[in-house]
Regions:
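Nucleotide-activated chemistry modules centered on ATP-dependent adenylation/adenylyltransferase
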Residues: 2-185
Length: 185
């Protein structure tokens, strides 16, 4: 494992490291970053391609905490998928539920202050709790270019406002490439 100074160096030279990692595969990126991380976490919403990142990270190191902010509004299919992943891969699933509960009838429309409060209550509050509990130095995520305008401004490596190194090993991959990866296991 690299020293804290080496991780600080990577954070201070993100552009150089992003350029260096651009033509590397996810396994290489994950292995390289794990060599400098003492407290990595992995996040998932158990969406269509989430197994790719969970599989790739767990191949490199067992037992990394997998943070799942369970909003309480998941489909049975998502719950079954999460259970299947937990049973088949060497992960340490950490499920965080919102402190505040909402019923279906309380769901706000997708705009305005009520919606922002809802998002804060069911997504951000549990995630902030997870970050406080795990105090990660590295956060593996499956965000990709082309998903949102904001995500298009990021890269393989980026920094959160809290200084956590955010790593997106599949950042430049297409849906087709991810389907191909998933078909291998």
């Amino acid at each position: 494992i690299m020293t804290d100074d080496q991780l600080l160096y990577i954070k201070a030279h993100l552009d150089e490291y992003n350029e260096m990692l651009r033509d590397k595969g996810p396994e290489h990126i994950i292995r390289f970053i794990l060599s400098s991380s003492k407290r990595p976490i992995l996040t998932s919403n158990f969406g269509p391609y989430s197994a790719s990142l969970i599989h790739a990270v767990s191949k490199q190191r067992n037992g990394i905490p997998l943070i799942w902010c369970d909003t309480g509004f998941n489909t049975q299919q998502t719950l079954n998928f999460a259970k299947r992943i937990e049973q088949s891969l060497p992960i340490d699933l950490k499920r965080y539920k919102p402190s505040k509960k909402y019923s279906e009838s309380e769901l706000p429309s997708e705009s305005g202050e009520a919606f922002q409060n809802f998002v804060n209550d069911v997504k951000l509050e549990p995630f902030k709790r997870a970050l406080a509990e795990h105090n990660p130095d590295v956060w593996f995520t499956n965000i990709r270019r082309g998903q949102t305008a904001y995500r298009d401004t990021l890269d393989i490596l980026s920094l959160t406002s809290d200084g956590i190194l955010k790593v997106s090993p599949f950042y430049f991959w297409t849906d087709t490439e991810l389907r191909g990866y998933l078909s291998q296991f």
